[in-house]
């Protein structure tokens, strides 16, 4: 899929967010329709994204312009493809955040899981460990800083973060991070 494609084209990134739990947890508990990555500021991702769009059988891709509330550079892409299961067009989103790595622990994980279809030789991605992802998820509950404001129609987003926190608390092994 998309994660495999952006890895195969050599795009330098850190895979984060709820979707990376599909690789970090032995048994994934929920699906997500977006891939969140971090790249270093100044990285020209346009050619990587265009080349990746030709690897997996995407029928279309487009950049979606969204206004952010802060000065952090972000870019968003929508990749459309025909589902091999339903034979209907569906999409996956690529959310790119331009910032330096602030994670204490990064690990390499193979793109492999019972819910993912991959082809050819194994592909690995760099991702924060479970402890760091838990820290990210907890920021969702800091609505006056980086989190999701409560009571503004984002209840489902808050519930997803809470669900992930419950899963991660059962898995973490470093309470000092």
Name the predicted role of every residue range:
Residues 1, 70-177:
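Catalytic cores of NTP-dependent nucleotidyl/adenyl transfer enzymes across multiple folds
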Residues 25-28, 48-51, 105-108:
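Short, conserved acidic/polar surface loops in the N-terminal third of protein domains
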Residues 29-30, 37-40, 68-70, 83-88:
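Short, charge-rich binding segments
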